[in-house]
């Protein structure tokens, strides 16, 4: 892990009770370093009428946000309040700094575009320029000329030379050459043209605050942290009938191995729920995982977490 990632603080925006991440670099960081996938909830600019492929922002579970806070790699910001406060108190210096950051992003986009264009032109240069066939060299053969034909050729050559000389004289007299080269032609000043961009975040406008609103504690947090610390990736499990879908690695590479539910340590679990969950997990080719943590007491903190897997073996 690089030093920049060691000091990285992920900004989690709390909006209407939801925990959202708007920066694509933060999304890549928490997925790569902390095994958090979460769910994209934004529309794609190229095709906003579909909901199969979604984009930023990334919506986190409350368990995700709490876990990142405990690891001290993120902070939660009350986004509406911070934006209103900053916009009302923005001075000229802050405004200039924000505009300069936008211009820097535009220059970066232009450099990336120019580099991609140069690579594309170099790649397709040979395809656009077909090879020219080599002209064949014909060696003329010497033929004997008669006296009359030789005189005719000489006369034609003399006439062509005289006509060429007259043409040169006429062109030189009608269009005199300019010899004054002391003042070179001045090029008109061209204003720098940069591509227009739409900023995806407003981080450059607001300061990096450290306000951390309270994150509600869910009963599923112990099981969630237990699985994450062991390298499992977790996504919503509604489509498989559980609270979570648990993957042994990145979901881009693996299928889910478990559908997981969290229970309280003293919570009574109906036997019918165990049977139906076990059968459902086996039907979707997964194991049903259930777990709970021993609660804290006056003498000790929260104890160990126990997890069990259930499979339906058949009749």
Curated annotation (Swiss-Prot):
Catalysed reaction, written as an equation: pretRNA = a 3'-half-tRNA molecule with a 5'-OH end + a 5'-half-tRNA molecule with a 2',3'-cyclic phosphate end + an intron with a 2',3'-cyclic phosphate and a 5'-hydroxyl terminus
Residue intervals passing through the bilayer: none
Domain of life: Eukaryota
Disulfide bridge positions per record: none
Family annotation (InterPro entries): tRNA_endonuc-like_dom_sf, tRNA_intron_Endo_cat-like_sf, tRNA_intron_Endonuc_cat-like, tRNA_splic_SEN34
GO molecular function terms attached to this record: lyase activity; nucleic acid binding; tRNA-intron endonuclease activity
Annotated Basic residues bias: 122-131
Active-site residues per Swiss-Prot or TrEMBL entry: 247, 255, 286
Region (Disordered): 117-138, 169-188
GO cellular component, one term: tRNA-intron endonuclease complex
Composition skew (Polar residues), residue ranges: 170-184
Family under the similarity heading: Belongs to the tRNA-intron endonuclease family.
Summary of subunit composition and partner proteins: tRNA splicing endonuclease is a heterotetramer composed of tsp-2/sen2, tsp-1/sen15, tsp-4/sen34 and tsp-5/sen54. Interacts directly with tsp-1/sen15.
Function per UniProt: Constitutes one of the two catalytic subunit of the tRNA-splicing endonuclease complex, a complex responsible for identification and cleavage of the splice sites in pre-tRNA. It cleaves pre-tRNA at the 5'- and 3'-splice sites to release the intron. The products are an intron and two tRNA half-molecules bearing 2',3'-cyclic phosphate and 5'-OH termini. There are no conserved sequences at the splice sites, but the intron is invariably located at the same site in the gene, placing the splice sites an invariant distance from the constant structural features of the tRNA body.
Name assigned to this protein: Probable tRNA-splicing endonuclease subunit tsp-4
């Amino acid at each position: 892990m690089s030093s920049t990632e060691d000091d990285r603080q992920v900004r989690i925006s709390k909006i209407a009770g939801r925990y959202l991440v708007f920066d694509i670099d933060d999304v890549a960081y928490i997925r790569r370093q902390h095994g958090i996938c979460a769910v994209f909830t934004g529309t794609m600019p190229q095709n906003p009428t579909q909901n199969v492929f979604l984009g930023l922002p990334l919506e986190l579970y409350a368990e995700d946000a709490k876990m990142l806070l405990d690891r001290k790699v993120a902070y939660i910001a009350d986004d509406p309040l911070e934006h209103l406060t900053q916009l009302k108190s923005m001075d000229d210096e802050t405004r200039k700094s924000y505009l300069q950051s936008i211009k820097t992003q535009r220059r970066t986009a232009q450099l990336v575009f120019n580099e991609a264009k140069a690579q594309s032109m170099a790649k397709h240069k040979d395809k656009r320029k077909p090879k020219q066939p080599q002209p064949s060299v014909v060696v003329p053969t010497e033929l004997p000329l008669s006296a009359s034909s030789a005189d005719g050729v000489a006369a034609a050559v003399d006439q062509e030379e005289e006509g060429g000389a007259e043409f040169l004289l006429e062109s030189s007299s009608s269009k005199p050459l300019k010899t004054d080269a002391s003042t070179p032609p001045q090029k008109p000043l061209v204003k720098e043209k940069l591509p227009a961009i739409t900023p995806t975040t407003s981080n450059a406008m607001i300061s990096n605050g450290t306000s951390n609103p309270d994150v509600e504690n869910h009963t599923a947090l112990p099981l969630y942290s237990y699985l994450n610390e062991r390298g499992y990736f977790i996504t919503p499990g509604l489509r498989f009938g559980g609270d979570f879908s648990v993957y042994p690695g990145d979901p881009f590479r693996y299928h889910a191995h478990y559908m997981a539910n969290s229970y309280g340590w003293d919570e009574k679990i109906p036997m019918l729920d165990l049977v139906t969950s076990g059968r459902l997990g086996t039907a979707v080719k997964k194991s049903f995982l259930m777990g709970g943590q021993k609660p804290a007491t006056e003498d000790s903190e929260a104890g160990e977490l126990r997890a069990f897997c259930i499979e339906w073996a058949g009749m």
